[in-house]
UniProtKB/Swiss-Prot annotation:
It comes from Gloeothece citriformis (strain PCC 7424). GO terms for cellular component: cytoplasm. InterPro entries: DUF167, YggU-like_sf. Belongs to the UPF0235 family. This is UPF0235 protein PCC7424_0673. Signal peptide: none annotated. The lineage of its organism: Bacteria, Bacillati, Cyanobacteriota, Cyanophyceae, Oscillatoriophycideae.
Amino acid sequence: MKIQVKVKPNAKHQKIEEAEDGSLIISLKSPPVEGKANQELIKLLAQKYRVTKSQISIQSGLSSRNKLIEILD
């Protein structure tokens, strides 16, 4: 499964919202430094979809707020 994600780093609270177009808007506490926000994003998505962190990969947007995430079943 592939999903579009818009990430908002440095938020006060972690939050996952669904946009009208079906993509996810995810607020993260971590700053976008040294991959910390990406690590938190993968951990949060693994919990939401009940998969291991190794089943989630960032296909595009590694250094962008807009990302394409692939989740393997």
